[in-house]
Amino acid sequence: MPFTQFKSLGDVLKTYNIKYIEDNFKIESQIKVPKHLVTDLNFTLKNIAYDVSEASICENLIYPILRSVWMPYVDIFSLWSHKPIEYDTFLSGIPDYLISKRSDLGKIVFEVPCIAVVEAKKK
C-alpha cells in the first residue's frame, strides 16, 4: 500500500505499534557551505524557473543542498533519489530522497537504517 493510503500519521502508528514522541532534535555542528553551492543556488534562483513543478524544485534546489551536505559523509552514508522502498505489503512508496548506511557491497546496494527526506506539500 502506498504511503498515501494511510489517512494520518496516527494510522501508521497504530498499524505498526510505533510510539510517538516529540522532542527537540538539534545537533550543533559547524557546516561550511561550499562557495560553489552558494554560486549555483544564486544562479538558479535568478535564471531558472525552479518553482514550476515538484520535479524542478527537487532537481534545482533540494538535491544540490542534500548532495553538498552528504558529500563529507560519502564513506558512511549513501544518498538515494526517488528510490522505491517497501516495508511490507501495506507500507511502501517512493520518497523524494533517502539517506542510508553505505553498504560494504557497493553503492548500488541499499542498506538500513535510513532517513527519508520529503518535501512539504500543501495537500
What are these regions (language model features)?
Residues 2-4, 9-123:
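A short, conserved, highly charged catalytic patch centered on acidic carboxylates
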